Amino acid sequence: MVDVNGFVVLNSGEVGDESNDGFGVKVEGGIPVGKMRISGMALMTTGDEDPDKGFKTLEGMLSTGGYWAYTYIFTPHGPSDVNNYGLEIGNGGYGLTTIQAKLDVPVTDKLGAQVQVGWFRSGEDVGASGKDLGTEFGGQVKYEVAKNLNLEAGLAFASLGDAGKTSSYQGVDESSVKEIFGRFQLEF
């Protein structure tokens, strides 16, 4: 079954010296292909050269990102949520445009695999570094050990754009970031 969802968020207001004026739009859809499922999403939020005056969500104001994306390095995402860039949909007030896709493959009844790709661009220049945050590729496997008990492992690679290397993120002066992750979790 094909599914489509999305949202439109319109923010207006101030908290202390910070404004959160702006809007965001997300469209997401998925379609089965045999036993596999292909999903994609596009998101755009407005920003400001002064991130204290740009679009922010409640998560952004609380310095959290929420699980909203498919990627592992640029965004918080389940088993890799340890040392990611923590992009929330407002990109800290700079605004964000991203296009992402994933493929979910059931290998057996208890084992599944997922591969993903995502492209990220800041709505406004991040300092003097421009807008290109980068592109990410990754994948993971998930094994159901018992009912609600899962073992997950994966890896991800991000090619950083100039804006992705700034101190607003990890302050990494590298052209890429690599990550290997795993999680053993009881889900209920």
Regions found by a protein language model. Give the residues of each.
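Repeated loop/turn-to-beta-strand initiation elements of outer-membrane beta-barrel proteins
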Residues: 1-4, 35-39, 109-115, 143-153
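Transmembrane beta-barrel architecture of outer-membrane proteins
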Residues: 20-24, 96-98, 134-138, 177-181
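Outer-membrane beta-barrel transmembrane domain signature
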Residues: 81-98, 102-136, 144, 186-188
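Outer-membrane beta-barrel "beta-signal"
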Residues: 174-188
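Extracellular/periplasmic loop regions
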Residues: 12-102, 166-168
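Transmembrane beta-strands of outer-membrane beta-barrel pores
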Residues: 8-14, 33, 42-48, 117-123, ...
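C-terminal beta-signal and adjacent terminal beta-strands/loops
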Residues: 148-173
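Residues on the lipid-exposed face of transmembrane beta-strands in outer-membrane beta-barrel proteins
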Residues: 27-31, 40, 101-105, 139-143, ...
